């Protein structure tokens, strides 16, 4: 069943067919056919909207629930009652719930279920060896596979995501997934922060931070130095981070660079 309690684009809801298929495979084939026809005309569904209806299951539901994590929402500027207090200490409006509801309607990450995909990406990249062709296909296959995980495994993965996104917020602040980039403009060229979170940073950084959870306190004790060193880190390795390339090789290179970057603070 499509994620309950969440009013996303109406196409994600009308796919709830009263199927008469005799087998699970037949039901899946029918869903796939419906989506192919819908996507060939009218409003085209985004990848995660399609996954949400075609491949719903325990892992998909977990991703949907974790997408409302207050730290993820704060870092990607997705409206959330709890995350408002992280971004604005003065946010104590009595109508905050109503405000969040209205803002969610206009938030593209939420409306297209990209927030749910962000969580799925975190889990899938832990199995990067399965990424062979298109990234979207990789996510599809991982979700199908992960929907079969035991409840105990899902519980552990849930804690891993929650602990890692909190660590990212603690260590690098609300702009943890911003990229320090080089820009050429008519008035000249300069370095500056790309002022929104990007998966170019999110994907490899979250992977590496999850590896360092056991050394979390040591890294947090050097938070000032780490934040100051990020700019020269990105400048030195900009050829690896520029652009939107996200093939397996790109992600692996970024993971290696982040891993080496954080290791030096544990060796001092």
Regions from the language model: what does each represent?
Residues 1-130, 140, 235, 239-246:
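Basic- and aromatic-enriched surface patches that contact anionic nucleotides/nucleic acids
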Residues 112-268:
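C-terminal subdomains that position terminal phosphate/3'-OH groups for nucleotidyl transfer/ligation
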């Amino acid at each position: 069943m499509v994620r309950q309690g969440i009013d996303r684009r109406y196409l994600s809801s009308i796919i709830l067919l009263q199927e008469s298929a005799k087998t699970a495979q037949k039901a899946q084939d029918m869903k796939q056919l419906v989506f192919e026809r819908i996507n060939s005309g009218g409003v085209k569904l985004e990848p995660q909207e399609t996954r949400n209806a075609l491949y719903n299951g325990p892992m998909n539901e977990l991703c949907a629930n974790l997408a409302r994590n207050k730290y993820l929402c704060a870092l990607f500027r997705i409206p959330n009652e709890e995350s408002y207090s992280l971004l604005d200490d003065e946010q104590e409006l009595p109508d905050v719930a109503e405000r969040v509801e209205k803002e969610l309607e206009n938030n593209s990450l939420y409306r297209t279920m990209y927030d749910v995909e962000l969580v799925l990406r975190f889990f899938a990249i832990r199995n990067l060896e399965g990424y062979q062709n298109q990234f979207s296909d990789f996510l599809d296959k991982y979700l199908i596979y992960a929907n079969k995980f035991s409840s105990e495994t899902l519980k552990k993965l849930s804690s891993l995501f929650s602990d890692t996104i909190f660590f990212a917020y603690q260590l690098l602040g609300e702009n943890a997934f911003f990229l320090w980039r080089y820009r050429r403009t008519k008035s000249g060229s300069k370095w500056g922060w790309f002022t929104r979170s990007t998966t170019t940073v999110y994907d490899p950084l979250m992977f590496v931070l999850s590896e360092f959870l056991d050394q979390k306190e040591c890294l947090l004790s050097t938070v000032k130095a780490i934040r100051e060193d990020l700019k020269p880190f990105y400048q030195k390795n900009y050829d690896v981070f520029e652009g939107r390339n996200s093939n397996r090789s790109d992600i692996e290179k970024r993971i290696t660079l982040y891993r080496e970057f954080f290791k030096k603070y544990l060796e001092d």
